[in-house]
Curated annotation (Swiss-Prot):
The gene is purD. Binds 1 Mg(2+) or Mn(2+) ion per subunit. ATP binds at residues 133-193. It comes from Brucella suis biovar 1 (strain 1330). Mg(2+) binds at E282, N284. InterPro entries: ATP-grasp (IPR011761), ATP_grasp_subdomain_1 (IPR013815), PreATP-grasp_dom_sf (IPR016185), PRibGlycinamid_synth_ATP-grasp (IPR020561), PRibGlycinamide_synth (IPR000115), PRibGlycinamide_synth_C-dom (IPR020560), PRibGlycinamide_synth_C_sf (IPR037123), PRibGlycinamide_synth_CS (IPR020559). This is Phosphoribosylamine--glycine ligase. Transmembrane segments: none annotated. Keywords: ATP-binding, Ligase, Magnesium, Manganese, Metal-binding, Nucleotide-binding, Purine biosynthesis. One of its GO terms (biological process) is purine nucleobase biosynthetic process. It comes from the Bacteria. GO terms for molecular function: ATP binding; metal ion binding; phosphoribosylamine-glycine ligase activity. It catalyses: 5-phospho-beta-D-ribosylamine + glycine + ATP = N(1)-(5-phospho-beta-D-ribosyl)glycinamide + ADP + phosphate + H(+). It is an enzyme of class 6 (ligase). It holds the Pfam family GARS_N.
Amino acid sequence: MKVLLIGSGGREHALAWKLAASPLLEKLYCAPGNPGIAAVAELADIGVDDHAALIAFAKEKHIDLVVVGPEAPLVTGLADEMRAEGIRVFGPSRAAAQLEGSKGFTKDLCARFNIPTGAYGRFNNAPKAKAYIRQQGAPIVVKADGLAAGKGVVVAMTLQEALDAVDSCFEGAFGAAGAEVVVEEFLDGEEASFFCICDGKTALPLGSAQDHKRVGDGDTGPNTGGMGAYAPAPVMTPEMVARTMRELIEPTMRGMAEIGAPFSGILFAGLMITSDGPKLIEYNTRFGDPECQVLMMRLNSDLLALINAAVDGRLDEVSLEWKDEPALTVVMAAEGYPANVKKGSVIRDLEKLESIDGVKLFHAGTALKDGAIVAGGGRVLNITATAATVAQAQARAYEALKLIDWPEGFYRSDIGWRAVEREKANR
């Protein structure tokens, strides 16, 4: 099969690596890709938002399957446009991608189909949003309705913080994404990410992960797209997984079909595990980044065969095989991230990681300049490891990371701390 993968991050490098291992694969292309992906795929210099050029490329190369990595092209309807041209594509329709593209859409769906989530209000102007906030009190959560690259959420611990968040949304901090805000109840508990692959009818669990959103050690500093992750999430016990499928995922699949937008693709539930059980924080309609990296490290099954089954509506025939060991990934980011990122610094000694057992390096925001690997974005490298325990995977990842010569890079030194503490307590 000839496959076109769309995207350029660490998530896409992990997908490319796994797709390249499939015996079904004849040729892998990636648009636009990155220097790490170039080792397993032929790169095409086409941006993820250039739908017409992506469609033309898929036709020219007789592509059998398109796999869409990031959320933005899905929310703007790339999958629909490709299907209209007769191209097989893995990813939700524009209508189904509203689960990620509009927080308000998802909250309304939860209300209609009795999916557990926090109480909420939707507002298209600041005075009404502020009145609701004053009525509810803090802590409270303020979210831009649309796509804001994981940065449009403020968990306000004080009333003033919440009111300021409303102002920044309506003053255009997130562009069109902030034209409407969702204000919702603060949920107390432990967060987890839960992933399913879906074919419109069936949702097959791909397991859980926990990511680390804040930039600094001890969960301090501003939110980011994610500074590291591990899988599985210990809080997602077999009972919690069963409840999540029964109370959240299955009603969502039924609800989306009922409103005429059946969901196929990756459904990523951001959960809060509360004393009452799982509640939905948000849905994403693609793999998480960096959660995808740890899921791919643990997946033994053929990813391409799995995606084919999803595209063909055959997931009810599929069973998956996973490694028993946990996986953990640490993000190395460029100086200044998540604010003003300094690009162009040279990264050396990456080849030293190639021979380490149980370690895989995924490229995210890397670029090639004069034959050298340089920082081309905010989150740049993902050092990923598997081992018998999370503590051992953590040690392995940090040991490998220290071999990289990149003074301008930084990372959190405590990725996996929750699971490591649990392991110690359970000894």
